[in-house]
């Protein structure tokens, strides 16, 4: 990046494709980088999964802490959590390209990486299926795997069509679902509207039990009881952290809900459930199936 007053160009991806706009942050995109020479760092488990599916993983020299699938990604140098990146640690890996979702940071770290002349491509972290397809195609262009990206996009579109048919036939549209984010038994954090959890619940054919708040917010016992979810969903990591189903039932108010009384409590791995990566159609189908079983 130019650290002076000059406006530079950053590539942003929208549903319509590439769009450039002026900012005084991040790096300009360098041209002429060959795929063989690329040293790629991927910030975001969903992005890393796409890189592997495009068979561009030989270009990877580092990933973030959420890049746990496939297992091979965990053997790469880890640059930490997406929201607390260290420019020094990233630059030590001598990358020639960094990809990340727009919620990565802090901005100063990304600015420092850009100042060092490293292209930084920020991808929208939207929670719609089309966002998954857009990320596949964008990464395909960045790693010079456009043909493979189109093959993958076509496969995902077929999987998505199949999932949508399954959801439409499942008849769980009145099922009220509460997503608990908490990994701390002393505080109940839930997924309100405009969250990845709310999007997955809706895609799976059910209703979010929390509709009056947006984002991930703490919830009082009275609000939990009033929400009265039919099913409670957690990540596998969250379920383990609170001590399993018995731990979930210890959250104030949960025992008084239908989900608590009937122990309709399910979990899925965090990135699989909330990452909106290439496994998203399968995750929606599995969540739908688990909800059907819980309500049977």
Predicted regions and their residues:
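Short secondary-structure boundary segments
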Residues: 44, 102-103, 125, 213, ...
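N-terminal secretory signal peptides and thylakoid transit peptides that target proteins
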Residues: 1-17
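Extracytoplasmic substrate-binding proteins
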Residues: 33-39, 108-185, 208-214, 263-296
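His/Asp/Glu-enriched short active-site or ligand-binding loop at hydrolase and phosphoryl-transfer sites
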Residues: 191-216, 236, 267
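Proline-aspartate-enriched helix->loop->beta-strand connector
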Residues: 87-100, 221-237
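A short, structured surface patch at a secondary-structure boundary
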Residues: 39-93, 97-107, 245
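A ligand-binding cleft/hinge motif common to bilobed small-molecule-binding domains
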Residues: 104-115, 233-249
């Amino acid at each position: 990046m130019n650290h002076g007053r000059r406006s530079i160009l950053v590539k942003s991806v929208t549903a319509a494709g590439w769009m450039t706009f002026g900012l005084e942050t991040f790096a300009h995109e360098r041209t002429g980088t060959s795929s063989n020479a690329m040293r790629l760092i991927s910030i975001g488990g969903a992005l890393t999964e796409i890189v592997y599916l495009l068979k561009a993983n030989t270009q990877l020299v580092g990933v973030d802490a959420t890049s746990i699938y496939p297992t091979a990604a965990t053997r790469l140098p880890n640059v930490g959590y997406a929201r607390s990146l260290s420019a020094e640690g990233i630059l030590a890996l001598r990358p020639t390209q960094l990809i990340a979702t727009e919620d990565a940071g802090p901005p100063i770290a990304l600015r420092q990486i850009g100042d060092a002349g490293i292209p930084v491509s920020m991808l929208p972290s939207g929670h719609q299926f089309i966002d998954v397809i857009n990320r596949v195609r964008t990464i395909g262009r960045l790693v010079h795997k456009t043909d493979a990206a189109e093959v993958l996009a076509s496969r995902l579109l077929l999987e998505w069509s199949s999932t949508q048919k399954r959801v439409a036939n499942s008849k769980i549209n009145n099922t009220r679902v509460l997503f608990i984010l908490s990994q701390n038994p002393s505080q109940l954090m839930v997924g309100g509207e405009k969250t990845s959890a709310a999007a997955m619940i809706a895609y799976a054919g059910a209703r979010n039990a929390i509709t009056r708040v947006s984002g991930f917010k703490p919830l009082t016992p009275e609000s939990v009881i009033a929400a009265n979810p039919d099913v409670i969903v957690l990540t596998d990591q969250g379920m383990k952290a609170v001590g399993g189903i018995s731990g979930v039932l210890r959250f104030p108010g949960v025992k008084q809900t239908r989900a608590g009384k009937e122990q309709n409590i399910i979990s899925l791995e965090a990135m699989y459930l909330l990452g909106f990566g290439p496994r998203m159609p399968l995750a929606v189908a599995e969540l739908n199936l688990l909800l059907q079983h819980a309500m049977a």
